[in-house]
Amino acid sequence: MKKLLVKELIEQFQDCVNLIDGHTNTSNVIRVPGLKRVVFEMLGLFSSQIGSVAILGKREFGFLSQKTLVEQQQILHNLLKLNPPAIILTKSFTDPTVLLQVNQTYQVPILKTDFFSTELSFTVETYINEQFATVAQIHGVLLEVFGVGVLLTGRSGIGKSECALDLINKNHLFVGDDAIEIYRLGNRLFGRAQEVAKKFMEIRGLGIINVERFYGLQITKQRTEIQLMVNLLSLEKQTTVTFERLGTELKKQRLLGVDLSFYEIPISPGRKTSEIIESAVIDFKLKHSGYNSALDFIENQKAILKRKKDES
């Protein structure tokens, strides 16, 4: 079973999350992803243990503010006795005095942040969900081209890294080379480099290079959403693959249960593979915006044939 310690969460967000109580229990285990709103638990309607981090924000503070001191204490006892691994107080939860008093019995780690609930969802909750996500490892290179996460695949030695280097020289962003960790959040896939290989790339004939040192911090990225998969194939060695000639529809490749848009690009000496990949990304974006070059071409041909027929 995957797990995350509260102290690991605190360390990850030490610049924006402060531990204000429960210092002895930061080894508590977070067993469930996400952040949990706990109004029903505060009302005593649920009695099962809480495995995820609880969040108290504007809604919960407003609810407590309408109660007497004794009622507030009982409500907070209802929550704390369910032993959540930690509780995060948002910026809107402005007065934790009663909570800290009741927590003397339970010593649940209480974290305070200047984030609102929405900001916590995009930062802390996303991080927690990533730790619990199913992770697959795939051999390839991950970049961000024109804002689109592109996973380059292909057999070893076909030139993925060299193609990626060309794209980096065109100011596209580098995420990782060789062993890419891919994880699913909802119906979206994200990718990152393995920790040991982060920032590094192997170029045959040159060796290992540190992309961040060579090209600067601005050219690297920690992770990206994978929207497009491009498989490089040797044109000389392919006898079974029928390559797309018109491109009326986007192919799909399933990865971790998510269908990714997929291109197969033949490579051979003299072909500018990096420019073809840039064109593939533009084609992908245009198709998603509703424009299809192949269909436009077909309609144009039909119009020409019709005009010639009418003239004859």
UniProtKB/Swiss-Prot annotation:
Provide the binding site for ATP: 154-161
Q: Give me any GO biological process, just one.
A: regulation of carbohydrate metabolic process
Check the record and name the Gene3D superfamilies matching this protein: HprK N-terminal domain-like (3.40.1390.20), P-loop containing nucleotide triphosphate hydrolases (3.40.50.300)
Region span, Important for the catalytic mechanism of both phosphorylation and dephosphorylation: 201-210
Give its E.C. classification number: 2.7.11.-, 2.7.4.-
Q: Which Pfam families match?
A: Hpr_kinase_C, Hpr_kinase_N
Matching entries from HAMAP family are given as:
HPr_kinase
Q: Which residues bind Mg(2+)?
A: 161, 202
Per the entry, what modulates this protein's activity? Answer: Contrary to HPrK/P of B.subtilis and other bacteria, that of M.pneumoniae is active as a kinase at very low ATP concentrations in the absence of fructose 1,6-bisphosphate (FBP). Kinase activity is slightly activated by FBP, and inhibited by inorganic phosphate (Pi), but FBP prevents kinase inhibition by Pi. Dephosphorylation of P-Ser-HPr by M.pneumoniae HPrK/P is strictly dependent on the presence of Pi, and is inhibited by FBP.
Q: Does the keyword ATP-binding apply?
A: yes
What family classification does the UniProt entry report for this protein? Belongs to the HPrK/P family.
Also noted in the record is: Both phosphorylation and phosphorolysis are carried out by the same active site and suggest a common mechanism for both reactions.
Q: What is this protein called?
A: HPr kinase/phosphorylase
What SUPFAM superfamilies does the record point to?
HprK N-terminal domain-like, PEP carboxykinase-like
Top-level lineage group = Bacteria
Database matches in InterPro entries: HPr(Ser)_kin/Pase, Hpr_kin/Pase_C, Hpr_kin/Pase_Hpr_N, P-loop_NTPase, Ser_kin/Pase_Hpr-like_N_sf
Catalytic activity line of the entry: [HPr protein]-L-serine + ATP = [HPr protein]-O-phospho-L-serine + ADP + H(+); [HPr protein]-O-phospho-L-serine + phosphate + H(+) = [HPr protein]-L-serine + diphosphate
Q: What class of enzyme is it?
A: transferase
Q: Where is this region: Important for the catalytic mechanism of dephosphorylation?
A: 266-271
